[in-house]
Amino acid sequence: MIRITRSGVYYRSGAFLSEEEGRTAGLPAPAQAREGTMAYGILKAHNTLDTMDRLAIRFDAMASHDITYVGIIQTARASGLTEFPLPYVLTNCHNSLCAVGGTINEDDHVFGLSAAKKYGGEFVPAHQAVIHSYMRERYAAPGKMILGSDSHTRYGAYGTMAIGEGGPELARQLLRKTYDIAYPKVIGIHLTGAPRPGVGPQDVALAIIGATFREGVVKNAVMEFFGPGVGSLSMDYRSGIDVMTTETACLSSVWSTDETTRAHLTALGRGEEFKAQAPADGAWYDGLLEVDLSTVEPMIALPFHPSNAYTIREFKANARELLRQVEADAAEQLGIKGAAPLTDKLVNGQFRVDQGVIAGCSGGTYQNLVRAAQILKGSAIGPDEFWLSCYPGSMPINLELTRQGYIADLMAAGASIRSCFCGPCFGAGDVPANGAFSIRHSTRNFPNREGSKPGEGQISYVALMDARSIASTARNGGVLTGADELPDCPADQKDESWSYDDSAYRSRVYFGVGKAKPETELVYGPNIADWPEQIPLPENLLLTAAAAIYDPVTTTDELIPSGETSSYRSNPLRLSEFALSRKDPQYVPRAKAILAEERKRRAGEATDALMGRDPKTTGLGSFVMALKPGDGSAREQAASCQRVLGGCANLCAEFATKRYRSNVVNWGMLPFIAEDVKDWNIQPGDQLYLPGIRAALERGEESVQAVLIQNGAERPVTLKLPGITQEEREIILAGCLINYYAK
């Protein structure tokens, strides 16, 4: 199905050559041949430096949704923002229901509209579109770069390199600064063949994620898609694969373009933006995935990660064993005990699920919902436990589905049709019952992301599947069914397009790009608060572990939950009360106790917490130890909540993603690496003393000597800061990005 080459290769005349074979054939050295990739050309066009070893990128456009844009604008405003210097789209597709916290969700939306008017932005009201559906329809085009404050900012299928980052990186662009990274690895994704009937984009995506995530095959790299298989796919199909590349932990993605791309852009009214884009003959890739689309089968990603992927055929053959493993994972990772066995859902050898959802930037495309409607037409979901909801990704998609009768077919079969928002993807809609098993064409199935509360003894399970197999399961009354098991499963066509009508946007969207109205007053609700002040890095630090997490991977959903908690993201202090609440409920009290002692120190009061050290030169703070933190969402609050609670560092064996590490740094925390940290057996209450830490950063050191204090015993340890840049040092020294720009 998928063949992986970890070493570099040349792409020449449709074949791949090793470095040695390329040398024999007279090809340029890899450093020169890399210029033949699509990624190189796009990055070079957006790089403001003379070198390509380090990049300082300016983007063509940006996008944020309603649980990130308030913090971004507040950060930029505190640093001197006067207008948006590039197109900035503010969507309202997360807290769209305004169902939690009284007025606070709609207060954020009102603030967003006032900011779009004041600074010159584009404002998409609630229920009009999911952020990524909107950006595909309105902005993505070959050769562009787009930055979004959502990790699934991926428009590679359009030839756009899009990157999802934490809010501070967007604030930098608003302040006319650059996005600074080392030149990334570029991994070739060579597609051949064509998908079978019943195999959808989520199936291809899950197969790729399952093959790459655990070994970090494409971590922090650009995934570059090309090959004859691209031509067999529609634009919706390509986008469905592309948006899920985030779950591989890659940095970005880009695809070759063709007449299908041109036709789609023309249908969107932007045909003039088309450019032909393909790798040059002899291009060098740092690694390679060869994917034969014809071999991909319907897939299922079991809880609790998209990489926990199996073919539906494999799952059915080993259901009891695999379900018991899910139960074991729930007990180990979530501390859930006494839950009803998942194996109880095996009835006469068939696995019965409780809920189906097709939603968002991955599931809610036109083609996915057409396939679901065709599969369900004339059938009935039935009156038992199983139910299905469908969320079109945008009003233009919804409008065309309605005009063509597909919405009626879905409704007649018993599916619920919801508005265009992201709710079930992050726990703000369709939360399953306790013990229920939901199958979803959405982006993630992390623990509790669907909205369950483990602190209250709740557990529900989410598996990822393609819309085609979800609809097939619905047609079969909730019995898990791969779409390829249907005798009449409709096939996908590469030229399958839809009539784009943006009248809903023209009727409701505020189009203010380049039309700043400085006299406009920002409208603040009572929950919208400024960022708390942070102090510069002290000369020395005494840090106490407020949490120690030994899971193989820690997600941003665990660091700061989504769902109803997201309603408080405009209030940093209030939101911080939820940090790690589902993973370690004692984290916040521990961190606050340490912060209270630090506040005493700053006020000149005596504190025993310093253990005799000079209060004028030694600061107190907390740190989080996790083996591999930061997989998942780009939300800056995963780091900012720690900082608001007095956090000064993360200590890990490795960071799961570049974007989370950037959030840690931009919020003034030290991103420490110790590959053998698991062996240190750090527990909450253990301490790290960092003498001369400020001077070490000022000297440019990439490792610092510290003292680990456990149960009264002290021993020296080395903490590494690999790859830390001069600007990152200065941000940490200043205390955070806001302080750095205020200098």
Residues covered by each model-derived region:
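Fe-S-dependent hydro-lyases/dehydratases of central metabolism
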Residues: 1-743
